[in-house]
């Protein structure tokens, strides 16, 4: 099992989004993922989730794992769900994933575990 974690100030993501708008969103979120955004906290949570997912692989966001190799969605209970691209799943021999996102006191944090 491998674990990745990321924490980000919600205000930091909010400022970047205010400055760059949809161009910022398009750099790391698919159109389906953009629908999940309800407020700056959820946007920061999505950023943290993708960063944590890349760190769980031990590589971070780079040429081996782009933001678009990681898909965030919701399950039937509205809990966050993580799916890697087929390439990542195969290259890193991933059989299971788990994602948790939380927001509090101006920060968003995400933790990812992969097996």
UniProtKB/Swiss-Prot annotation:
State which residue ranges cross the membrane: none
Q: Which GO terms describe its molecular function?
A: holo-[acyl-carrier-protein] synthase activity; magnesium ion binding
* Catalysis: reaction(s): apo-[ACP] + CoA = holo-[ACP] + adenosine 3',5'-bisphosphate + H(+)
Necessary cofactors = Mg(2+)
- InterPro entries from the xrefs? 4-PPantetheinyl_Trfase_dom (IPR008278), 4-PPantetheinyl_Trfase_dom_sf (IPR037143), ACPS (IPR002582), Ppantetheine-prot_Trfase_dom (IPR004568)
The yes or no answer to whether the keyword Amino-acid biosynthesis is present is no
Q: Which residues bind Mg(2+)?
A: 6, 51
GO biological process: any one?
Answer: fatty acid biosynthetic process
The UniProt keywords, alphabetically, are: Cytoplasm, Fatty acid biosynthesis, Fatty acid metabolism, Lipid biosynthesis, Lipid metabolism, Magnesium, Metal-binding, Transferase
Q: Where is this gene product found?
A: Cytoplasm
The cellular component terms of Gene Ontology attached to this UniProt record, alphabetical and capped at eight, are: cytoplasm
On whether Lipid metabolism is a keyword of this UniProt record, the answer is yes
Top-rank EC class of the record's enzyme: transferase
Domain of life of the source: Bacteria
Family annotation (Pfam families): ACPS
Q: What is its EC number?
A: 2.7.8.7
What is the protein's known function?
A: Transfers the 4'-phosphopantetheine moiety from coenzyme A to a Ser of acyl-carrier-protein.
Q: Which family does it belong to?
A: Belongs to the P-Pant transferase superfamily. AcpS family.
- UniProt protein name: Holo-[acyl-carrier-protein] synthase
Instruction: Kindly list the organism's lineage.
Output: Bacteria, Pseudomonadati, Campylobacterota, Epsilonproteobacteria, Campylobacterales
């Amino acid at each position: 099992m491998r674990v990745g974690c990321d924490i980000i100030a919600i205000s930091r993501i909010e400022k970047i989004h205010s400055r760059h708008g949809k161009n910022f969103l398009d750099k790391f979120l698919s159109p389906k993922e953009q629908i999940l955004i309800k407020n700056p906290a959820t946007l920061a949570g999505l950023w943290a989730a993708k960063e944590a997912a890349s760190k769980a692989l031990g590589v971070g966001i780079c040429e081996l794992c782009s933001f678009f190799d990681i898909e965030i969605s919701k399950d039937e209970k509205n809990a966050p769900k993580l799916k890697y691209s087929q390439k990542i799943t195969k290259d890193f021999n991933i059989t299971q994933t788990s994602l948790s996102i939380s927001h509090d006191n101006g920060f968003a944090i995400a933790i990812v575990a992969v097996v």
